[in-house]
């Protein structure tokens, strides 16, 4: 079965939870001059422009905002904090639709045998093209946001969609997928079990899988998903340029299977080469498969097992995507593993910002990078990491708020009721 060859272990990071608010490891393989075949495949020349051309045609498309948290930056002693707010992406509350829509577009273009030109969305919706394509059912597994994006794209183009979720997926996230006409199947176990189940059933039912994670023999579509994500990176660079900034010095990006993180890493490696920003990958400590893969030090992706019980539902993945791993193992500098209270703190800080800063609605998976940055900037026990990352007054830091309020009930428990509180030893000294 896919990815069955990955070594699996239960993480023992929580044994050190009393020492630091997060665990970190430096990537010894992050050579700034090194390239890899996976990166060349991921981002061939011109692919970001093709993705942006498609996304501009989507109903309701506009660039999501890039927000400056200048007040918080001053408080933390850094030059600037810039947040790409994907909670405002196409009214879908997440960036994920960028990947799912582009993967479907590329699949249909290939199925139609069109290589010498790009298709328009109007052409894809035309009766002539639909008659040629016939009945297609797209299928995927999700923790919520990717499935919602695929369901939206399938509905926009008039195709059926089946989405598999694991048993811990919240009812609001399931309803959000069903709102776009998809059939939802709930699978016992974790997200990784849902991936295995949809792979099995898709073969039996003739469905076409649109997954953001790869496995042996299935790489084209996950590659297209990651290419779709580069639209938001191109938007960021355009928006930063409008503020007189050529590039961020540091990027903190969250990771589940690693698809978005690899797209970010690959985009900046291709754009800036050795001058690329310092990149930190941020994961839940209970689902830190990329952190664990770096820690093992053998150059191979490693899985983590267990229930993956974290409030960061969108990042609760035990199996890294091999395609993403090939890029991240060479292009990411640091890997951080965070307990849930780090994400909860980020949610509250976004929602009740420093005076003068804009407020941002951010879900658990969207906010963990802000929480991690705050501890990194202020906690004395992380001084070595600050030094290694060269974080200081000249730093221009990029964060991506990958999701908004995708589970309103849990959001209120954390933000309104103070759920998942910060332990006393890790609270700010006021």
PLM segments and residue spans:
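PLP-dependent amino-acid enzyme catalytic core
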Residues: 3-430
């Amino acid at each position: 079965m896919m990815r069955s060859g990955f070594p699996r272990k239960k993480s023992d990071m929580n044994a050190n939870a009393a020492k630091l608010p997060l665990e970190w490891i430096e990537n010894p393989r992050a050579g700034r001059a090194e390239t890899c075949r996976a990166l060349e495949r991921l981002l061939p020349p011109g692919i970001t422009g093709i993705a942006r051309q498609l996304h501009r045609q989507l109903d309701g498309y506009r660039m999501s905002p890039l927000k400056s948290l200048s007040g918080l930056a001053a408080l933390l002693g850094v030059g600037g904090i810039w947040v790409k707010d994907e909670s405002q992406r196409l009214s879908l509350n997440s960036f994920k639709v960028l990947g799912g829509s582009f993967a479907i577009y590329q699949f249909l273009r290939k199925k139609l045998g069109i290589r010498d030109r790009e298709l328009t969305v109007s052409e894809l919706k035309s009766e002539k093209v639909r008659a040629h394509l016939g009945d297609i059912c797209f299928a995927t597994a999700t923790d919520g946001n990717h499935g919602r994006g695929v369901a939206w794209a399938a509905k926009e183009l008039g195709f059926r969609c089946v989405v598999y979720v694991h048993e811990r997926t919240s009812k609001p996230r399931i309803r959000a997928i069903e709102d776009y006409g998809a059939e939802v199947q709930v699978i016992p176990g974790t997200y990784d079990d849902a991936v295995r189940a949809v792979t099995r059933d898709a073969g039996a039912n003739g469905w076409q899988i649109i997954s953001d994670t790869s496995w042996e023999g299935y790489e084209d579509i996950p590659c297209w998903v990651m290419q779709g994500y580069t639209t938001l990176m191109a938007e960021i660079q355009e928006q930063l340029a409008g503020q007189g900034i050529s590039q961020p010095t540091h990027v903190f990006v969250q990771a589940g299977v690693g698809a978005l993180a690899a797209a970010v890493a690959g985009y900046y490696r291709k754009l800036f080469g050795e001058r690329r920003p310092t990149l930190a990958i941020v994961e839940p400590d209970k689902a830190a498969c990329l952190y664990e893969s770096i820690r093992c030090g053998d150059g191979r992706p490693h899985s983590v097992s267990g229930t993956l019980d974290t409030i960061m539902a969108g990042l609760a993945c035990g199996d890294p995507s091999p395609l993403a791993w090939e890029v991240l193992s060479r292009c990411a500098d640091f890997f951080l593993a965070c307990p849930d209270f780090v994400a909860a703190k980020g949610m509250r800080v976004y929602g009740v910002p420093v005076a003068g800063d804009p407020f941002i609605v951010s879900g658990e998976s969207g906010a963990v990078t802000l929480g991690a940055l705050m501890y990194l900037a202020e906690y004395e026990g992380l001084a070595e990491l600050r030094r290694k990352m060269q974080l200081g007054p000249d730093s221009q830091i990029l964060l991506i708020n990958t999701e908004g309020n995708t589970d309103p009930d849990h959001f209120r428990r954390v933000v309104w009721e103070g759920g998942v509180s910060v332990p006393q030893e890790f609270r700010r000294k006021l």
